[in-house]
Design a protein with these regions (language model features):
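NAD(P)-dinucleotide binding in Rossmann-like oxidoreductases
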Residues: 41-46, 56-128, 145
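C-terminal helix-rich "cap/oligomerization" subdomain common to oxidoreductases
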Residues: 56, 131-167
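Short beta-strand scaffold segments in enzyme catalytic cores
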Residues: 51-53
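Active-site rim elements
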Residues: 3-6, 37-38, 116-120, 140-142
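Hydrophobic alpha-helical segments typical of transmembrane helices
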Residues: 14-17, 128-132
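Predominantly a Rossmann-like dinucleotide-binding segment in NAD(P)-dependent oxidoreductases
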Residues: 1-43, 166
Length: 167
């Protein structure tokens, strides 16, 4: 069996989110790597990948994706996102607040006023999924434009094809 690779599989979400959060319509790949650390019985499998991108506005992005969830983690996958700005940063903990709280959906941020934490579980919702479903059915572009989706797909394919195999 074959598949598109880990960068197209789960990395595509990180690339799309980078374009959205940074306000970029385009980016270029700086570096990408993939590896197979724990599945030697499946030589074509990739259980690790990482990518570095630079957006057209100079915003930079690094992400790592893997299929290496430890058995002791209370959920499948970690799902953290870090957004670093010039005056602070935000950390999104989507699925678990590791070793602290069994609830999901925590936002941490640091700015000139201090350190902050907000439990947003049950407060924010998931409007994107409903909007995307309606976009597919109604041929609208509410969740994202087709151009945005295709650019994210193009960037993940380029990252996958150009990735160095490190293991």
């Amino acid at each position: 069996e074959t598949y598109s690779g880990i960068l197209c599989d789960i990395g595509s979400h990180q690339i799309e989110q980078f374009l959205y959060y940074s306000g970029c319509d385009n980016a270029r790949g700086v570096n990408s790597q993939v590896g197979n650390y724990c599945h030697s019985q499946y030589p074509e499998m990739e259980d690790f990948g990482e990518v570095s991108l630079v957006g057209e506005n100079g915003a930079s992005n690094y992400f790592r994706v893997d299929w290496l969830t430890p058995d002791g983690l209370s959920t499948w996958g970690d799902g953290r996102t870090f957004i670093l700005g010039t005056k602070g940063y935000i950390e999104l903990r989507k699925y678990v607040d590791v070793a602290r709280d069994q609830t999901k959906d925590h936002v941490y941020w640091v700015d000139e006023k201090g350190e902050h934490r907000e439990d947003v579980s049950g407060k924010v919702g998931y409007p994107f999924f409903q909007e995307l479903l309606h976009d597919c059915i109604d041929r609208t572009e509410t969740a994202m434009t087709q151009e945005h989706a295709l650019k994210a797909g193009e960037l993940c394919v380029i990252a996958q094809i150009s990735a160095q195999k490190i293991k």
